UniProtKB/Swiss-Prot annotation:
Residues 621-690 are annotated as: WH domain. A motif (DEAH box) lies at residues 326-329. Found in a multi-helicase-TICAM1 complex at least composed of DHX36, DDX1, DDX21 and TICAM1; this complex exists in resting cells with or without dsRNA poly(I:C) ligand stimulation. Interacts (via C-terminus) with TICAM1 (via TIR domain). Interacts (via C-terminus) with DDX21; this interaction serves as bridges to TICAM1. Interacts with TERT; this interaction is dependent on the ability of DHX36 to bind to the G-quadruplex RNA (G4-RNA) structure present in the telomerase RNA template component (TERC). This is ATP-dependent DNA/RNA helicase DHX36. It is an enzyme of class 3 (hydrolase). SUPFAM superfamilies: P-loop containing nucleoside triphosphate hydrolases. The DHX36-specific motif (DSM) form folds into a DNA-binding-induced alpha-helix that together with the oligonucleotide and oligosaccharide-binding-fold-like (OB-fold-like) subdomain bind to Myc-promoter G4-DNA-containing structure in an ATP-dependent manner. Upon G4-DNA-binding, DHX36 pulls on DSM in the 3'-direction, inducing rearrangement of the RecA-like 1 and 2 and the degenerate-winged-helix (WH) regions; these rearrangements are probably responsible for the ATP-independent repetitive G4-DNA unfolding activity, one residue at a time. Residues 1-192 are annotated as: Necessary for nuclear and nucleolar caps localizations. CDD domains: DEXHc_DHX36 (cd17981), SF2_C_RHA (cd18791).
Length: 1000
């Protein structure tokens, strides 16, 4: 039943008075606290209450007081008379759409002279669009074709190598053989051969090739430095060329990280006396960047995600002869999924050769997963490394902590943080049980002083004072060689750096101290690979990035802090957690291996022998500790079957709870229907290479014509923001970031402002770009990556029909890009329901804000946010990208949003009455005051928006903003006009002293 929007409008065209109802400014329930009886005057508790009852009485009274304060703080949703009348006419006109002959000729202008009118679409047109959509859905489910692709170039760019044919070519076979023979006389090739022959893998060349040729799947295990990544692919290619069938060989080797794919490809090309790519034998392909090799007789190194993307275009990888999955022991989510896909693919591609390459410790597990396929081990190439445990270090350097307020061993238990998995709790119990016997055993071999220090050590923290003392000892007592320190995160790296620099000795030019972290400027990090001059000692302080991603050749001393930052996903509370946890045995082994690459080395582990015996063999696979929404969409777009069924066949299947929660979230997002099939929106989100909420934001940025800034935000959220934090300049960097915020109260718009400033500086020349990045602590490499990603997103939108140009800056797609409020509305559309409420706390000393979420209660804005110290908010709602529990629950990347943003782009709307207040609520908890007639207008407009958006998603085409008679233009213009003109929302009935605070 439709609502009559005329019923609330008086005959003279103005709004009817809503009446004061239960009148006048509050008063009301004076005695609501229950007062009465003797002592109950002036808010005191009743005299008959005793002990705990008194506390409960006051708690109940405070709860009632808080609820009433919250009621009074509700913002008022209102609109002026002119807009109200216009929207009444618009909605009544749209309701008449079933009358085929009615075509409203209404046209009017908002106060900003922004006219919007309506033209009723015919039923015939709607039916034809639905019919077209049904045909397309049928295509999606039955054929391997792209959904509504009008321009295939955006798919083909990263798939160029895959889409090339691989047919036998006798002429090419002969040419490849001649080229290889010619290489053997090339001085560069000969020099490289000398190096290659020293690698352990080189002596096993014949054995490796025979095993691969005679089996469909082979597992190769080998220690760091054995040469498996660079040599195995070359052995295969050269064998094919020498057998005269080189054109049939197309090897693709996956790498878990971009930096690895590039560096390995360049190394292999150099070993073959060639340049990387350019039609030679070796190249690489990573997202938005490639140097492709020749079409046939070639090796391509690529990131795992590239293969998953290829599978959308060719589910059988028809043109690939060999697929090498490298570093699979790392167990990242994409490699685990790809293994299962490849396992299924083997049934259809009996000619496909699969080579799995892993570190030594768990090769058997991969062999078992692939039907007990053959394994071969390549020995490592490292010098002996002496290992020291915590008790050895304390004894060796005679360490005694200056501060004695260390906590007990068992105050927080085996694991730091909030990860309470059963196996961890069991290990904690074992640790506590064995500790007395372990200490007793140590007393026979170590001094009493060492035992005392061990007893007082705080297991929760990495002892940075101990590390500083150990570095000093190595520098003064041991021989030359670089020192590599492994720490969990940025805060530890920063503190240790400060500790060292506070000592006069380390300030001299005899030391080069290099922090290595993703937040650090990359220009500083290039020094890490350079050999230092004689007399200068390099000290590298790094996270686990230095375990496998990069190799620092001159390291002799490794200090293993014993902890690693690990993200988990708590399915019960629907929250990500990050904590510093103990390393696994595999981590410890990798760290030890960093010390013996060029000469005998030393590795110092900052945990005791009992702890070492209880370490996990490996880190928990990523798929068991991460949200699965993006993966679920990939499973559906690749047509891999039912989500739960496919995930159950992984090497380590995620929990049923995690799968159910992800499917539920995707249904709430309207990406999956009740049968777990992709909706039209789901198809678009699955094709975008970002997580679903960011994908939805991208689509809305196109629909609401604020494309360029929204793509900047989406790229930053899915990659990383461009800010860097040089050590010692943290406060200046924070100040510069707040300067870029420009009073937007938005981390997202801060990135937009930073990016636009960079674009302007870049247009003026390299020197201006460099100065701009230096002044505002920005990474030009990251900004360039964001620029490239924006181009990729725009091509996806063009291919799907949402925009008419591949340029993010196309004027037609950016009509509203200068309007901050509309951009915030689109951010809200993408990130909802990630909403938090702000409450202004007017304390005696200074104003403060408290932030709450529906499920967690009190939370904190992350210290790096531009909103962390903000008190003058215009509204009291934030939308955020990420909620993570570390030492407390933090909100990352948040933006203040207005009531209309939440009403039009949030959840379900309901209209209710709360005592004397008429209210409109979003999902029952985001509540605003609103006269009933206004609430019905908003709800009616929201309903029309939902219908329009559904049509746009099912049959994408750009909005024609010049067609002021169309329904699309009329509805969108009315909504955008309300959002743009939303005033600061101050509740009508707040006490006068609070009127300087803004609410909504």
């Amino acid at each position: 039943m439709s609502y009559d929007y005329h019923q609330s409008w008086s005959r003279d065209g103005g709004p009817r008075g809503s009446g004061q109802g239960s009148g006048g400014g509050g008063g009301g329930s004076r005695g609501s606290g229950g007062g009465g009886g003797g002592r109950g005057g002036r808010g005191r508790h009743p005299a008959h209450l005793k002990g705990r009852e008194i506390g409960l009485w006051y708690a109940k009274k405070q709860t009632q007081k808080n609820k009433e304060a919250e009621r009074q703080e509700r913002a008022v949703v209102h609109m002026d008379e002119r807009r109200e009348e216009q929207i009444v006419q618009l909605l009544n006109s749209v309701q008449a759409k079933n009358d085929k002959d009615s075509e409203a000729q209404i046209s009017w202008f908002a106060p900003e002279d922004h006219g919007y009118g309506t033209e009723v679409s015919s039923e015939k047109k709607i039916n034809s669009e639905k019919k077209l959509d049904n045909q397309e859905k049928k295509l999606l489910n039955q054929e391997k074709k792209t959904y509504r692709i009008t321009d295939k170039s955006y798919i083909d760019r990263d798939s160029e190598y895959l889409l090339q044919q691989n047919e036998p070519n006798l002429g090419l076979d002969q040419q490849l053989l001649e080229d290889l023979q010619k290489k053997k006389t090339d001085p560069r090739y000969i020099e490289m051969q000398r190096f290659r022959k020293k690698l352990p893998s080189y002596g096993m060349q014949k054995e490796l090739v025979n095993l691969i040729n005679n089996h469909q799947v082979t597992v190769i295990s080998g220690e760091t430095g054995c040469g498996k990544t660079t040599q195995v692919t070359q052995f295969i290619l050269d064998n094919y060329i020498e057998r005269g069938i080189g054109s049939a060989c197309r090897i693709v080797c996956t790498q878990p990280r971009r930096i690895s794919a590039i560096s390995v490809a360049e190394r292999v090309a150099a070993e073959r006396a060639e340049s990387c790519g350019n039609g030679n034998s070796t190249g690489y392909q990573i997202r938005l960047q490639s140097r492709l090799p020749r079409k046939q007789g070639s090796i391509l190194y690529c990131t795992t995600g590239i293969i998953l993307q290829w599978l959308q275009s060719d589910s059988r990888l028809s043109s690939v002869s060999h697929i090498v999955l490298d570093e699979i022991h790392e167990r990242n989510l994409q490699s685990d999924v790809l293994m299962t896909v490849i396992k299924d693919l083997l049934h259809f591609r009996s000619d496909l050769k699969v080579i799995l390459m892993s570190a030594t410790l768990n090769a058997e597990k991969f062999s078992e997963y692939f039907g007990n396929c053959p394994m071969i081990h390549i020995p490592g190439f490292t010098f002996p490394v002496v290992e020291y445990l915590l008790e050895d270090i304390i004894e060796k350097i005679r360490y005694f902590p200056e501060q004695k307020e260390h906590r007990s061993q068992f105050k927080r238990g085996f694991m730091q943080g909030h990860v309470n998995r059963q196996e961890k709790e069991e290990k904690e119990a074992i640790y506590k049980e064995r500790w007395p016997a372990y200490i007793k055993e140590l007393q026979t071999r170590y001094s009493a002083s060492t035992i005392d220090v061990l007893e007082m050590m705080d297991d929760d923290k990495v002892d940075l004072n101990l590390i500083a003392a150990l570095i000093r000892y190595i520098v003064l007592e041991e021989e030359d060689g670089a020192i590599l320190v492994f720490l969990p995160g940025w805060d530890n790296i920063s503190t240790l750096h400060d500790l060292l620099m506070s000592q006069v000795m380390f300030k001299s030019d005899r030391f080069l101290i290099i922090p290595l972290h993703s937040l650090m400027p990359t220009v500083n990090q290039t020094q890490v690979f350079k050999k230092t001059p004689p007399g200068v000692r390099k000290i590298v302080i790094a996270t686990n990035i230095a375990e496998t991603s990069i190799t620092i050749d001159d390291v002799v001393y490794v200090i293993d802090g014993g902890k690693i930052k690990e993200t988990h996903f708590d399915t019960q509370n629907n929250i990500s957690t990050m904590s510093a946890e103990w390393v696994s045995k595999a981590n410890a082994k990798q760290r030890k291996g960093r010390a013996g690459r060029v000469q005998p080395g030393h590795c110092y582990h900052l945990y005791n022998g009992l702890r070492a015996s209880l370490l996990d063999d490996y880190q928990l696979p990523e798929i068991l500790r991460t949200p699965l929404e993006e993966l679920c969409l990939q499973i559906k777009i690749l047509r891999l079957g039912g989500i739960a069924y496919f995930l159950s066949r992984l090497m380590d299947p995620p929990s049923d709870e995690a799968v159910v929660l992800s499917i539920k979230h995707l249904m709430e997002l309207s990406a999956l229907d009740k049968q777990e099939e992709l909706t039209p929106l789901g198809v678009h989100l699955a094709r975008l290479p970002v997580e679903p909420h960011i994908g939805k934001m991208i689509l809305f940025g196109a629909l609401f014509c604020c494309l360029d800034p929204v793509l900047t935000i989406a790229a930053s959220l899915s990659f990383k923001d461009p800010f860097v934090i040089p050590l010692g300049k943290e406060k200046i960097a924070d100040a510069r970031r707040k300067e870029l915020a420009k009073e937007t109260r938005s981390d997202h718009l801060t990135v937009v402002n930073a990016f636009e400033g960079w674009e302007e500086a870049k247009r003026r020349g390299f020197r201006y770009e460099k100065d701009y990045c230096w002044e505002y602590f920005l990474s030009s490499n990251t900004l360039q990556m964001l620029h490239n990603m924006k181009g990729q997103f725009a091509e996806h939108l063009l291919g799907a029909g949402f925009v008419s140009s591949r340029s993010p800056k196309d004027p037609k797609a950016n009509i509203n890009s200068d309007n901050e409020k509309i951009i915030k509305a689109v951010i809200c559309a993408g990130l909802y329901p990630k909403v938090a409420k702000i409450r202004l706390n007017l304390g005696k000393k200074r104003k403060m804000v408290k932030v709450h979420t529906k499920s967690d209660g009190l939370v904190s804005i992350h210290p790096k946010s531009v909103n962390v110290e903000q008190t003058d908010f215009h509204y009291n709602w934030l939308i955020y990208h990420l909620k993570m529990r570390t030492s407390s629950i933090y909100l990352y990347d948040c933006t203040e949003v207005s009531p209309y943003c939440l009403l039009f782009f949030g959840g379900d709307i309901s209209i209710q009455k709360d005592k004397d207040q008429e209210i409109i609520a979003v999902d029952e908890w985001i509540v605003f005051q609103s006269p009933e007639r206004i609430a019905h207008l908003v709800k009616g407009l929201r309903k029309e928006l939902d219908i329009l958006l559904q049509e746009k998603i099912e049959c994408p085409h750009p909005v024609d903003w010049n067609d002021t008679k169309s329904r699309d233009c009329a509805v969108l213009s009315a909504i955008l006009d309300l959002i743009k003109t939303q005033e600061k929302a101050i509740p009508r009935n707040l006490p006068p002293r609070s009127q300087d605070g803004y609410y909504s």
